[in-house]
Each structure stands twice: as structure tokens, then as C-alpha cells.
A protein has these predicted regions:
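Active-site-proximal loop and beta-strand segments within enzyme catalytic domains
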Residues: 25-35, 45-49, 87, 96-170
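Active-site helix/loop module of the DD-peptidase/beta-lactamase fold
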Residues: 100-137, 186-224, 229
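Active-site-proximal alpha-helical segments within enzyme catalytic domains
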Residues: 89, 177-181, 225-246, 305-321
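A short, well-structured edge-of-sheet supersecondary motif
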Residues: 47-77, 307-308, 314-318
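Active-site SXXK
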Residues: 68, 82-107, 134, 178-182, ...
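Bacterial N-terminal signal peptides
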Residues: 7-16
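Structured C-terminal helix/loop/strand segments within mature extracytoplasmic catalytic/sensor domains
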Residues: 299-349
Length: 349
């Protein structure tokens, strides 16, 4: 029998609340959902094709949001599961607030901050990496890290092979150390801070501080910080960045920080990399192997966790894969195809 996505009845009723073309751009306590995507200009046939494609590739839930309203949703979007590496984009928001508050200086070095690690400890050269270098994944510190897969460990460059700031390598050591720097600078645990500074102001419906946990390693001092978040809360976070950090009349994350974070500083196979966000544009301007819409940016995590923001269309595409529900992985090229299909189904295309 053909598998189908399901929706809890109460959630469906909530999402199906009347949603007209005139909206505030952000959801209130509940998401609004288009009563008829076709009447709003969306292709019903192409949306059905997207549903079939999601089942084909193994997504466990997904959402399309335009103008702050749910166009379509599949799966249990209230179910919380591991965001994996999307955690880094979440941390970005907290660091941006701390920078604006004067608690973190992007140009401070690891040496100045007293950062070292287990033996073999950091060299004097490695300690010259700055907070900015870590945000860009250009620290040049290739120490073992918590929550590092076997493949990541095998691909890690040799220690001392690149000076700080000169080479991009997607590096869990950088990201985990940023978490430590944030907690030390603010005196607040990441999950408590995220709940207070982000989740509550933007009305996340499901997240609590208990939905975060740390993963440690015998090889490094700095733990990974993992978030279990629902698809609908993840979509709210993406919408916050689509709106340059503003939610209704409140500037939750500084606008200049959002803009700095979502521009490319390095090239990657699908475009570029900013401050803990992936970008559809490359830093060099050269086309890359996997194509996302121009000007887009996204959070990305293991197994197929994505929140893709397409500012030119006021559009968000969320894809989730719960590893407790399936053994499948949705790959980046498949997500690029998903976004392409969504854009093709949108009004005017």
C-alpha cells in the first residue's frame, strides 16, 4: 500500500484557519494556512507532485510557507526531532544578540579568550584564530571534536596545514567552541538562552529548554549542543531570518547581523557559507555543483534537515527527516530539487 503523510486532526484544524492574502507576515499563536492554494495562484497539480516527491525521497515532514502563511504541510509538523547541524544556525542568532550587547567581540582571538583543548593542545598559531574565523569555519584548528562522524574525522585536514582565516573547512570543533564562547561570555546555557531570546519572542509552539542536550567527547573539552525542534517551530525561526531578524514590531536579532550572517565568505558545493548559514550564492561568484535560488540561504543538518529561505519570493521551504522514523537520508541535491519544484509551483511561475 502506498504510504501517505498524515496530519493530527487538531493540528490540521488549527492550520486550516482562514488565511487571506493580506497578512502581517508572521503567524500568531497558530500558523494560518491558505484555504485554497490554487485560488492564491499556486499550482495544485505541482503541489501534488511535491507531495509525491517527498514520499519518494523519504521526508517525514515538510512545510511550504509564503508571506508568513502555510501554503502546504505534510507529516506531523508538531513532532520534535533532532535538528543535527541546523543547531549552528540557531546558535548564530544568540551570538548576534551577544555581539550587539557587547558581550562577544568577533575579532578576539582564542588566545585572548583563554581557549585551549585536550592534548594535543592548540598551538600558538591556532590560538590566533578569531571568533569571526570560527563563525566562518575558517579557524585552521583541526583538533578532534565532539559529535564528529567517522567521515568527518577522516576528512579533517592535518593540524597546522592552514593558517587561521585562510581556508574553509566545515569543522565541528569551530562550532562546538563557539557554543562554549557564548555560554562563557553570557553566563547562560544555550538552551535557556534560545528559549528566552528566540523561542518565546517568536511564539514557538513546541520548544522548551528541555528539548536541548549536550554531547561530549573524550577527545575535546567542548560539547556539541543538540536541539529537538518541530518543523513548525523551525519554520518560525526561518521566517525570523527572512524578515531580517524582526518579528512584528520587535527586532529580535539585529538586522545587520542577519545580513552579515547570510552572505557568503567561502565557496561550497551548493553556493557558499556565511556565519553558520549556507548560502545559494558563492563568495567567488562562480556557479557551484548544486544550485539553489539566487539570494537564498538555509540551515542544513544530517539526514536531511533543511530550512531554506528564498527572500525574492518571500518563501520558506522546510524539510525534516526523523532518524527514529526512517533509515533514509534526504541529500542536498534532492532538497535543491524540492526547492526548484516549490518555486515552479508558486504564483507567477
Amino acid at each position: 500500500m502506498r504510504k501517505s503523510f498524515y496530519f493530527p486532526v487538531l493540528l490540521l484544524l488549527a492550520l486550516a484557519a482562514n488565511a487571506n492574502s493580506q497578512t502581517s507576515g508572521v503567524p500568531a499563536a497558530e500558523w494560518k494556512r491558505l484555504a485554497s492554494p490554487e485560488q492564491a495562484g499556486w499550482s495544485g497539480k505541482k503541489l501534488a507532485g511535491i507531495r509525491d516527491y517527498l514520499e519518494e525521497i523519504g521526508s517525514t515532514s515538510a512545510m511550504i510557507v509564503q508571506h508568513g502563511v502555510v501554503v502546504a504541510a505534510w507529516g506531523d509538523v508538531a513532532h520534535k526531532s533532532n535538528l543535527h547541524s541546523c543547531r549552528k544556525s540557531l546558535l548564530n542568532s544568540l551570538i548576534g544578540i551577544a555581539v550587539a550587547d557587547g558581550k562577544i567581540n568577533l575579532d578576539e582571538t582564542l588566545e585572548k579568550l583563554g581557549i585551549d583543548d585536550k592534548k594535543p593542545s592548540l598551538t600558538d598559531v591556532e590560538k590566533q584564530a578569531t571568533v569571526r574565523d570560527l563563525l566562518e569555519a575558517r579557524s585552521g584548528v583541526y583538533h578532534a571534536a565532539a559529535y564528529e562522524t567517522k567521515g568527518m574525522a577522516e576528512e579533517r585536514p592535518q593540524r597546522g596545514s592552514h593558517a587561521p582565516g585562510t581556508f574553509w573547512y566545515y569543522n565541528n570543533w569551530d562550532f562546538n567552541t563557539l557554543g562554549h564562547i557564548y555560554e562563557t561570555a553570557t553566563g547562560t546555557k544555550i538552551f535557556d538562552a534560545f528559549y528566552r531570546e528566540i523561542a518565546q519572542p517568536i511564539g514557538m509552539q513546541d520548544f522548551t529548554p528541555r528539548d536541548g542536550h549536550y554531547v561530549t567527547s573524550p577527545d575535546s573539552l567542548y560539547p556539541a549542543y543538540l536541539f529537538d525542534i518541530s518543523a513548525r517551530d523551525f519554520a518560525r525561526f526561518a521566517l525570523l531570518y527572512l524578515h531580517d531578524g524582526k518579528w512584528n514590531d520587535t527586532q529580535v536579532v539585529p538586522e545587520d547581523w542577519v545580513k552579515a550572517s547570510t552572505r557568503p565568505y567561502s565557496d561550497a558545493e551548493s553556493g557558499g557559507y556565511g556565519y553558520l548559514w549556507w548560502t545559494g550564492d558563492s563568495a567567488s561568484g562562480e556557479p557551484q555543483r548544486i544550485s539553489f535560488p539566487k539570494g537564498s540561504f538555509w540551515a542544513e543538518g544530517h539526514l536531511g534537515q533543511y530550512a531554506v529561505v528564498v527572500p525574492s519570493l518571500d518563501l520558506i521551504v522546510v524539510n525534516r527527516v526523523d532518524g527514529d522514523m526512517t533509515k533514509r537520508t534526504v541529500h542536498k541535491r534532492q532538497v535543491a530539487r524540492l526547492v526548484e519544484m516549490v518555486v515552479a509551483a508558486a504564483p507567477g511561475n
